[in-house]
């Protein structure tokens, strides 16, 4: 079996473990404080992660899909959560959120392209993400409106995010003398910028939807996550039965 396929199976199994754990948390909703517990925040983060993962996966491949699901989505959920409780956006927070996303992008670049590109892309993306957080701050106040909202602030965030990450991808490819550096960088910039803008625009609807979910519905989501997690973990055991071995 090819090395990248083996790595994919291992990551799929790890994802299954994470989904199974999340499902267990949902089923223990009452034990974790009910409406005052962390599960609604987790639901929002997972929702954003699925949307980021889908957008990145369809255009940039499986590794960026995982970066979107495991890092970009939760980061946006935490940003909005901090905004909703009145927490400021200090420089330390900017570094934390920026480095989280940059690390995931660097790993995705490493696995989808090569190690040198991934290292360069991770470092340069960190500069771009932190600059975005420091200059533009947290998501706009309209995030609490309960309906999709696009204004100059949302568009500015999308353009700045897309330009900075696209430039990071172009420079990373150019440093490594890759012939398609410009094309790939423009592609990455467009995808990240458009995805960021759209997700921030629809975030008010996601926030309102999750806040109004019935408790029983959350239990149903927990059961679904447990099932999906079990299927992901089962995949590694099915392959040997089909005669496919490492």
Segments and roles (model prediction):
Residues 2-19:
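Hydrophobic transmembrane alpha-helical segments in integral membrane proteins
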Residues 10-15, 65-67, 91, 114-123, ...:
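Hydrophobic alpha-helical transmembrane segments
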Residues 13-16, 38-50:
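Loop-to-helix transition at the N-terminal end of transmembrane alpha-helices
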Residues 29-44, 69-96, 100, 104-118, ...:
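Cytoplasmic membrane-interface regions of multi-pass membrane proteins
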Residues 231-246:
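Juxtamembrane boundary at the C-terminal end of a transmembrane helix
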């Amino acid at each position: 079996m090819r090395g990248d396929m083996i790595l994919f199976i291992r990551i799929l199994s790890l994802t299954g473990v994470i989904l199974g754990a999340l499902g267990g948390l949902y089923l223990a909703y009452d034990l974790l404080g009910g409406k005052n517990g962390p599960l609604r925040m987790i639901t929002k983060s997972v929702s954003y992660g699925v949307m980021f993962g889908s957008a990145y996966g369809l255009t940039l491949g499986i590794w960026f899909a995982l970066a979107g699901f495991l890092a970009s989505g939760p980061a946006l959920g935490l940003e909005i959560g901090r905004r909703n409780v009145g927490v400021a956006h200090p420089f330390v927070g900017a570094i934390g959120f920026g480095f989280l996303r940059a690390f995931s992008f660097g790993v995705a670049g490493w696995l989808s392209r090569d190690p040198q590109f991934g290292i360069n892309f991770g470092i340069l993306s960190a500069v771009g993400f932190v600059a975005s957080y420091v200059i533009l701050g947290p998501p706009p106040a309209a995030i609490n409106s309960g309906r999709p909202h696009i204004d100059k602030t949302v568009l500015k965030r999308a353009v700045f995010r897309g330009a900075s990450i696209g430039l990071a991808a172009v420079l990373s490819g150019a440093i490594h003398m890759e012939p398609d550096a410009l094309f790939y960088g423009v592609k990455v910039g467009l995808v990240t910028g458009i995805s960021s803008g759209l997700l921030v625009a629809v975030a008010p609807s996601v926030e309102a939807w999750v806040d109004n979910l019935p408790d029983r519905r959350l239990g149903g989501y927990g059961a679904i996550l447990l099932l999906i997690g079990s299927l992901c973990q089962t995949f590694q055991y099915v392959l040997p039965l089909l005669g496919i071995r490492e």
